Each structure stands twice: as C-alpha cells, then as structure tokens.
C-alpha cells in the first residue's frame, strides 16, 4: 500500500497584515492594508513571487514586514510555521542601492556576514567561492567594488545574501538602476540561481515585463495603502530567454497585467 502524498505546507504565510507609519508629529500613514498570501514549500523548486504595483504603493513595506525589519500594525508573518518578529539569517535582503564595503574585496564582502557569525575561515572560503561561482564572479574574488560594473556589484549583493543559505530572499527592485541589457542578464542569472539554491524569492518591481519574465506567481497591488487586487499565475515557460519577451503569449500576459494595474480600483 503506497503512502498518501503529503500536501505541501506554506514556507511563508502572511496573514491579514496591515502596516501604519506614525510620523514625528503623530500623523498616521497607512502603507499596507489586510495583505494575505501563502507561498508553499516545494522541495527542489525555487519559487519566484513578484509584487507588481505603482511606485510608492507599499510594496517595499511588505518586504520589510517579512524581513522582520518592520512589525505589522495588525496581522502576522509566519516562516515555516514560526512567527517572524525580528531579522534572521533565514531571510536575506537585496536592495536597489549598492551596499558593498569599498575597502573589502569581493570575496571578503561575501564572507563578511559569515565572519560575524563566527564561521571558521576554511568554511567561509568554501562557501563564498561556491556562491561566487554561481553568480559568475569567481574570477573577480580578489577585486574591489570600485573595479566592478553596476551589474557585477549586484551580483556581489546576491552572493552575499545566498552565502547565508536563507530560506527566503527578499529583493527590492534590485535591477532598477541597471541599463536594459544588464538587467536582462541579471534576470536570467536570478532564475538560474533560484533553481540551484531552492530559495523562495519575493521580488518587488513596477516593471511589468520584468514581472512576467521572473514570476511563477504575480500579485498585482493597489495604490497606497497596498492591497492585493489580483493573483496571476504565470505559465511555466519551457525557455525563459530574451526571445520570450517578444512572443505573443508573453505580450498577452503583459497586457493582462497592465489592464489590471490601470483599471479603476476599489475605494481605499
């Protein structure tokens, strides 16, 4: 008698999360309202979930709540069933701004967090070289950030996050400052890395094409306060390369998302 397959449990569960900022004068700004979603744990399959919405709508605030950097005003965030109350190594964050230390080499930047954790030098070296190889920077391990292009600096940031082996990687418009060709290359790199590392990736963007290209699932958000308007499951394309972006099916999904973004929204 064969065993009954067990249903996948949520790796990440965000339940009725609202976030309100309080200014110095006591004024309140509601950034996120009643956001709920589950991301299932699918062993051997890196999941990319994209939040698509207008600038300033509250996308980044959702990431900060998941990261433990900003406690929800209401609701809760669970990672593998455990409440998130503070930052932890099981979550890593990549920002749009370059965050490398200029006085450290590429490899030293990647190892920095491991060093603070007390990881032995031999293990630090092995783990850093492994992720540098994944992001295509092993030959630049001894270089300094000033010697790198913008895309290479973001590869360093991704490697520095991956070396900690997080369950969830949070990416806040990490490719927004890059030129289009470099951005396409970084998008492809991200998809490759997600398959290797088996991470859950939460990715914030206001670029519709980027959302379609990267996402397994896309959540379309309202203007502030951020609410989930639609969930769109993106087809599992056989090949995700630059030619996909000119295909009829890709453009049809882009149009669908654009229509959702610009449709009249329910009153806040």
Task: For each feature predicted by the language model, list its residue ranges.
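Conserved ABC ATPase "signature" region
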Residues: 111, 115, 120-140, 192
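Catalytic Walker B motif of ABC-type/P-loop ATPase nucleotide-binding domains
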Residues: 169-172
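Conserved signature/switch motifs of ABC ATPase nucleotide-binding domains
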Residues: 143-146, 164
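ABC-family P-loop ATPase nucleotide-binding domain
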Residues: 1-28, 267-268
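Helix-to-loop junction immediately C-terminal to a conserved catalytic motif
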Residues: 67
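Conserved ABC transporter NBD signature motif
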Residues: 75-86
